[in-house]
Amino acid sequence: MERRGRATEAFFGRRKGKALREQQAETLNSLLPAFLIDLSAAPPEPLTSLFPVPVTTLRLEIGFGGGEHLIHRALERPSTGFIGVEPFVNSMQKLLARAGQTGARNIRVYNDDATQLLDWLPDASLDQIDLLYPDPWPKRKHWKRRFVSKTNLDRFHRVLKPGGLFCFASDIDTYVNWTLLKCRDHSGFDWIADNAADWLTPYEGWPSTRYEAKARREGRSSAYLTFRKI
């Protein structure tokens, strides 16, 4: 698959932080091949056969950070296949280390631009997409880099099954408002909310993450939005 130029479709920042220690590098190099999705091959039919264990539903998490949420959900729901996208090398290493330690086998990963994976996925193949605490790109000149856009909502709509869910969490008010407006203007999604508690209460079974704890310490509350494909 052709690699996109970062000038046009780069929704992530840096790809590498501190140099990995030798053992961390060994973990990454030994485990990544077994978990990595190869986009040069056509998607398998059915897509659930990506996983070495039987799964009945499929869920995508874009930008899984340290992997706390993804691992928690994978262990909580062994019959769901989880696809995680994260271009940041250090975060990928942490996720794979946790997968190795816990024995979670219902996980597959992609380590580049999420739009490439979305374009590779078959129509109506996913039950849920999670975009949790994405980079808010706070400067106005960078807003075009925010992952929530009409183009990406079109991508979400194509790959989600009818009635599939798009879940978005953020502690940045401007990005929450941005997402509400983008989804309102998109004809393919309904916001599932009857009252404030619906978007101020964490998702069922939600594990707090380090990023969320940091936001709390700094006095920021979070919003948890859920949209259904129509």
Curated annotation (Swiss-Prot):
Pathway(s) the chain acts in: tRNA modification; N(7)-methylguanine-tRNA biosynthesis
GO molecular function: tRNA (guanine(46)-N7)-methyltransferase activity
Active-site positions on this chain: D135
Enzyme Commission number(s) of this protein: 2.1.1.33
Keywords carried by this UniProt record: Methyltransferase, S-adenosyl-L-methionine, Transferase, tRNA processing
One cellular component term from this protein's GO annotations in UniProt: tRNA methyltransferase complex
Binding site for substrate: K139, D171, T209, R210, Y211, E212
Top EC class, one word: transferase
Binding site for S-adenosyl-L-methionine: E61, E86, D113, D135
Source taxon at top rank: Bacteria
Catalytic activity: guanosine(46) in tRNA + S-adenosyl-L-methionine = N(7)-methylguanosine(46) in tRNA + S-adenosyl-L-homocysteine
InterPro entries registered for this protein in UniProt: SAM-dependent_MTases_sf, tRNA_(Gua-N-7)_MeTrfase_Trmb, tRNA_methyltr_TrmB_bact
Pfam families: Methyltransf_4
Sequence similarity: Belongs to the class I-like SAM-binding methyltransferase superfamily. TrmB family.
Protein purpose: Catalyzes the formation of N(7)-methylguanine at position 46 (m7G46) in tRNA.
PANTHER family cross-referenced by the UniProt entry: 3-DEOXY-D-MANNO-OCTULOSONIC-ACID TRANSFERASE/TRNA GUANINE-N 7 - -METHYLTRANSFERASE, PENTACOTRIPEPTIDE-REPEAT REGION OF PRORP DOMAIN-CONTAINING PROTEIN
Protein name, per record: tRNA (guanine-N(7)-)-methyltransferase
UniProt source species: Rhizobium etli (strain ATCC 51251 / DSM 11541 / JCM 21823 / NBRC 15573 / CFN 42)
Lineage: Bacteria, Pseudomonadati, Pseudomonadota, Alphaproteobacteria, Hyphomicrobiales
